[in-house]
Amino acid sequence: SPDNKTVYSNVAENGPFENFCASAALAKAYLVYKEEDNVFANWCLRSAKEDFEFAKVGYEQGIYTKRWGPNIDSQVCGHGAIAAVELFKCTNDSYYIDVAATYGKTILACQQSTDPDWDIPLKGFFYEDKEHKWMLTYEHRGHEQSPVQGLCMLCEVAQNHPDYQLWIKGLELYREYVLKSMELTVPYG
């Protein structure tokens, strides 16, 4: 047994965000290994699908880990879209595009899409939630890229989806936010 008792203070938990991250990584692994080691690749794909479903159902049921607290919609849905697109690339199953598109709607609902009544109005950034209560920010390990990466990946694989132009608009708003932020942070931007 380990001498360091802190090992036991971080128990394994089943959370949607963690499962979406694992699902995306395992789907990528399937694509990398499918020609080289079919047995391992197929295990990766099965595990990716299982982790994806655990995450999807867990998010729908409001399950979250004690360690990190309640789900952050834009982050979880961003990684949900990423995992779904990675699984679509592996399976070509439109189910994953449908689920990713649902997460895309939530991502866009978390985005500031109009000019707020501020001295210096900014739009295009993301909130944690659809109610726009808390801005999506991190002070240590960050996941601000999750919503944008999820929308980008959706655009790559689903150009004919009815929400495609909405995803593009969301990405354009984020670009506007980054450019405006650069102006406001000169000489650092």
For each of these PLM feature ranges, what is it?
Residues 1-189:
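Glycan-recognition and catalytic cores of secretory/periplasmic carbohydrate-active enzymes
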